[in-house]
């Protein structure tokens, strides 16, 4: 696809949207960080429950002055985080993973941005902590591999092998169960892909890296950054 290679102007537009995305995500994190824990383990702030819906409202309100909109923002908590596409609903809980996947679109330029963070109010289980550390290491490893000439498949498969070596599943309904990443532009999912069928990457490709681990009954962890393939790496 001709759209796979972005111009300098397109890249600048997408960096701008990602900057607003980062601001909105920070506002969401601050809402949760400033919350208290009620007697049932739920999060409250200013005597009101901190819900998935409330967090989405904060994100939307932060993006609105920049002519950006969010749709289907994922704010999931607890065992819901084991389902990558679960939007999340209701009161967030302490000591549980909270996955925030925010992908706004600028309504003036029509370009998207994309990022995901996993946080917790209060220490989560040791299992979730270990999953987080593995996902973070996988993301950093993938970023270091990205460069012109490598294939999306090579990077995806390297991350899968890394998770396997750590003792996590990579072939079934648990563990690492989705592609490592995807292109972003005028669509939130476009070419090129970091997947088992991903082709050769070239300068100007804008892609996400979003490794994740998911275990029903336990929860999930996903981290996602967006960047551009440069002449000698990934920025």
Predicted region positions:
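Active-site neighborhoods and metal-handling regions in enzymes and metal-associated proteins
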Residues: 1-235
